[in-house]
Amino acid sequence: MSFNYSEITHNDSLKIGSDDAPLKIVEYINLRCPDSKNYEENVAPFLNEYIKNGTVQRVLKHFDKQKYPLEVGNVLNQYLNYNNSEETFDLVKKLFADQNTLGRNRLAAIPHLAHDYCLSL
């Protein structure tokens, strides 16, 4: 099985780093996925030096996986502002930091979560 890389777009993605960077790293995340949080907290910091010197650009794309524990992340993603990558990336980091709290919520809590995180529904 091969993957068609030509179908990857930067639509609905957060870009961290220069568009002119020669290396683009496309990362698929879910705001409620513990592996995504682990990567962001423990692996991604090693890329900061390369982002700062213009070698690497991170392209974060949401992975909408139909799995009960991830449903809140799926819905919250719909309200992220992809036109302001820096501000939205700060929010993504906050959502990862609060992931355990988010996990206690279900879809009925989305309006309250949106209010708490200043998301417009």
Residue ranges and their predicted role:
Residues 118-121:
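Thiol-/selenol-based redox modules, centered on thioredoxin-like
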Residues 29, 37-115:
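Structural alpha/beta surface segment adjacent to cysteine/selenocysteine redox centers
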Residues 6-23:
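A short beta-strand-turn-helix
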